[in-house]
Amino acid sequence: MTNRVDHPAGGYKKLFESTEELVAPVTAQVTGRIPVWLSGSLLRCGPGLFEVGSEQFYHLFDGQALLHKFEFKGGHVIYHRRFIRTDTYVRAMTEKRIVITEFGTFAFPDPCKNIFSRFLSYFQGLEVTDNALVNVYPVGEDYYACTETNYITKINPETLETVKKVDLCNYVSINGVTAHPHIEHDGTVYNIGNCFGKHFAFAYNIVKIPPLQADKEDPINKAKVVVQFPCSERFKPSYVHSFGLTPNYIVFVEQPVKINLFKFLSSWSIWGANYMDCFESHETMGVWMHVAEKHTGEYLNIKYRTSAFNLFHHINTYEDHGFLIVDLCCWKGFEFVYNYLYLANLRENWEEVKRSAEKPPQPEVRRYVLPLDIHKVDTGKNLVNLPYTTATAVLRSDETIWLEPEVLFSGPRQAFEFPQINYKKHGGKDYTYAYGVGLNHFVPDRLSKLNVKTKETWVWQEPDTYPSEPIFVSQPDAIEEDDGVVLSVVISPGEGQKPAFLLILNAKDMSEIARAEVDSNIPVTFHGMFKKA
């Protein structure tokens, strides 16, 4: 997994090229044999348009949302894609310019307005983007594409048509939610986002959306806040991209990447800024971990602390004999990793990409162990007595518990990211295997399987190919955890190859079973899901 491959041809730049949606689905060219039991659709979200008219988007998370679908039918694969008709997209296409500010791109006022109208537009309230480019997930019988604001977009998973925009602020107290909700077996949805808590201070709310009931009412109408976590700084909430969930507990990791509320409100309304302009790093905070009981909503007033890291993706969290095991894809340090994900950086030639990747926090897969019972223990002693981990938790004299992790994978500028597991059977439970994209200086150039118990790895990699997040699909008659396949969208810009393909791997050993090639480039996709037929 740590074997380094160079990319002097710069084929990875094709990940960040605009494309067009398809008028109609196309049949992919299959080599190999697709398992007969594999029936359903892989849905993926990502940016598909990196400029509007003469105006460029600047950040990886700015491009207009493109929804992809690979449908498996009787050994064939049908590919389709459509732009999501968000308000952001429709207005941009109508006005032929960037109309709503994105994560790293400020939308300038309409140049056709006079100077007085443009001045007033700064004070007419913040227009929040609904550009749903990050993920897609089910709620009841419906499917929603999402970003990380208060807006989610209902889509038709069969036709990829956009159905409607939903503002979650109309249902719960939330400023925005993550693109990584947890979905339980019965369809219950849990998510987290920041909110205004007591005394106008920021807090973090856990939102619960129940499964579809016999009355067939939209489950979102019944959404409610079930847990509230405190914020370490009153007016500076941390950036949160995911969280941990077990059958009995919710885990929230508060990282030192902060949103400065005053900067957010003043800069946006007075001189114009984007979301990235409002982040700042807290150099001395480290990381705070919070735990709450899932069923009662009780916040456990245990002060877990550790050294600084960036966190975007939880791998899995589970309970074991009075401990919570929390496995994370970490980036070591307090500086915001997203500072290095501007498109100009990602499109550089290979040597410059490598130089740039030397600067940000470096990646590491870590296991933290959080003790839940800390009564009658001695200060200064390690509270972790599980035989299979070297992670420690030490009670300090100030009543904080200092956590040191066990490192499950580490390689210089070699990340294991966009993790997936056999979620249906092992989400929130003890598990053995995780699947991820291998990032080589931020360039995705391999797919990896990690045994979190032995640290053994398996890798799929081909020259000049760039895969996406691996999605695990279990066999219907699976006995073992890794009985199934791994799906990934891969671009292949090399000569003599089709521009892109859907890769199907044996989840046991990461060997190729089949691929389904298409005749058009597929830009980078972030997250998605497999919808069974």
Curated annotation (Swiss-Prot):
EC number(s) per entry: 3.1.1.64, 5.3.3.22
Catalytic activity: an all-trans-retinyl ester + H2O = 11-cis-retinol + a fatty acid + H(+); lutein = (3R,3'S)-zeaxanthin; all-trans-retinyl hexadecanoate + H2O = 11-cis-retinol + hexadecanoate + H(+)
Cofactor entry: Fe(2+)
Lipidated sites in chain (S-palmitoyl cysteine): 112, 231, 329-330
Cellular compartments annotated: Cytoplasm; Cell membrane; Microsome membrane
Cofactor binding note of this UniProt entry: Binds 1 Fe(2+) ion per subunit.
Binding site for Fe cation: 180, 241, 313, 527
Cellular component, GO, one term: endoplasmic reticulum membrane
A UniProt-annotated Pfam family: RPE65
Example GO molecular function: all-trans-retinyl-palmitate hydrolase, 11-cis retinol forming activity
InterPro entries: Carotenoid_Oase
Tissue: Retinal pigment epithelium and single cone cells but not in isolated rods.
UniProt keyword annotations, A-Z: Acetylation, Cell membrane, Cytoplasm, Endoplasmic reticulum, Hydrolase, Iron, Isomerase, Lipid metabolism, Lipoprotein, Membrane, Metal-binding, Microsome, Palmitate, Phosphoprotein, Sensory transduction, Vision
Entry membrane topology: Lipid-anchor
Family to which the UniProt record says this protein belongs: Belongs to the carotenoid oxygenase family.
Role summary: Critical isomerohydrolase in the retinoid cycle involved in regeneration of 11-cis-retinal, the chromophore of rod and cone opsins. Catalyzes the cleavage and isomerization of all-trans-retinyl fatty acid esters to 11-cis-retinol which is further oxidized by 11-cis retinol dehydrogenase to 11-cis-retinal for use as visual chromophore. Essential for the production of 11-cis retinal for both rod and cone photoreceptors. Also capable of catalyzing the isomerization of lutein to meso-zeaxanthin an eye-specific carotenoid.
Protein name in the entry: Retinoid isomerohydrolase
Organism the protein comes from: Ambystoma tigrinum
Source taxonomy: Eukaryota, Metazoa, Chordata, Craniata, Vertebrata
Gene name linked to the record: RPE65
